[in-house]
Amino acid sequence: MGQRTSQATLQSSTHFTSNSDILKSFNDRALKQFTVTELVSFKNKLGKDLNERLTNEELTKWLSVPQDEILLRELLYNFVQVLGNFPLMKNSYENVTGIGVLKAIILTNPERCKKYVKSRNYDQLKLWFIALSIRKTVKEDPNLSSSSSSEESFDVTRILKTFDGLHVNELSVPFAYMVPFISWLLILTTYCPINNCKLENVAMFDNWNSYIKSAHTILRSMRPMDESSWIEYEPFAHTMRSIAPHIFDPLTRVMEHLLFKDDELVDPLSENRGEIASSKLLNSALLAQISSALSKQLPIYHLQRLYLGRDHGFSMRSFQAKVFKWSAPTIMLLRGKRILDDEEYSVKNTRFRKFLHEYPKLKPSDMDTEVEEMYPAKSKIILAVYVSDPWKITNKEFFGGPHTTIVQLSPFQEVFGSSRENALYFNTIGGGIGIGNKQPVIKSTAKSYSPGNVSLTMDSALEFAVLRHAGQGGVLKPGLVVGDKDFEVKMLLQDVEVWGCGGEKELEEQLKQWEWEESEAKRRQQINLRSIGEDRALLEMAGLVGQAQSGGSV
């Protein structure tokens, strides 16, 4: 791959006389973060001098942004522009250039970023929010100081620590801009699982509206008042860290893919992986949304259809016949229509009336009206339950590993993780399916469910389900968005599906395959330094060749 040169140390005692000096120092330092092959491949893709201006059209084409998504193109161009002017994000706005894009590649990659800023605790998420929120079209004089004290102004340590004196709590991103941005990240989750991914798949944006829908779901977790509102930092950071911690992973990959020549890119969908799983309920957007919460636990390209209630019948017997032979993790998907008025619906449906009698109701006084508003009357409730262990009949016992997780996918995204093992039961003597519950009490003449504080209960006919959230102390942890709020949502199930995930062996093989493909691409990047021609000046500027440098083993 080629050895990396030692990084130029930027001590806090280094004296800078202007913002231009600071920018030049960080630009030079950025070049030293890359190998010879990476720089040459990038220069080949760039097709121009590193200091020449890049247009919006050029940059967004490389990043596979739909041409008709004007807001997204504007947002991403500004995003890269801000990162390209790091660390002076407030006072100096140069054009987007090749050097700026290289800095953006570094700053969107957690490992590269830590080395670049020389801090393992640097808050990258805050940096990204700043880059998303700042809009600046007029370039200021880079030699102007950011305060009245020039000595304080040119203190790089302070600039890094304070994000150039920006107050992030005073910044915000328009909801209208954030929707296509999150949608784009979700699409990349599907189509860019590796760094050297080829993004010329014409079908990528066929289901754009589905990804928009999933993006809305994630953004609702930030509790915006309406679609004309603005997203502020605190709800943004809390949501991304808690219920969508992997949403930015594909951003790292799509930026890294700029370091590969076009003939070194591969299409993951064409590499003998088959089509992405789909059904009446499941689609690629929903899978990407689940991946934002579960990441590597969900192998998008290896899901197997095991049970679909619509096709196989809504019964425990059909469920058992189709699912129990699968010896690896599974995802159970539920979609239901919320039952708004228990009493009114029980008059129409005698089976629901019987279920109400068996299920202990949460006291109305305990219900949080604010959370109730988060489940609109006509909204569909979609849940994904990740089950790491094989399913089995447990009429008295329980099963399930410590990674059992419920991910709510609609009407807003939420995560209910497991606090310990054995969170599930599959009761074939009338108890149905429970996650986070005690076993139901079943007698010849009566039945009584025992829901946990945070739990999901399904009746034995797979007709009704209840999501309860009533505090700490149970097998499942409270939601990370709703927190300590108490509520209960009853639903009429319309879809129940179970999809088989690849086991550890399959996941390991997939990761090894992707790693091999990337290493092969990097091997093909190897160049003969004696014939690099015009690229030699670039490498000398980076300190990788010339001046007694060997250029590394390439």
UniProtKB/Swiss-Prot annotation:
It is found in: Cytoplasm. InterPro entries: TLDc_dom. Pfam families: TLD. Disulfide bonds: none annotated. SMART domains: TLDc. GO terms for cellular component: cytoplasm; nucleus. Its main location: cytoplasm. May be involved in a process influencing telomere capping. Belongs to the RTC5 family. This is Restriction of telomere capping protein 5. It comes from Zygosaccharomyces rouxii (strain ATCC 2623 / CBS 732 / NBRC 1130 / NCYC 568 / NRRL Y-229).
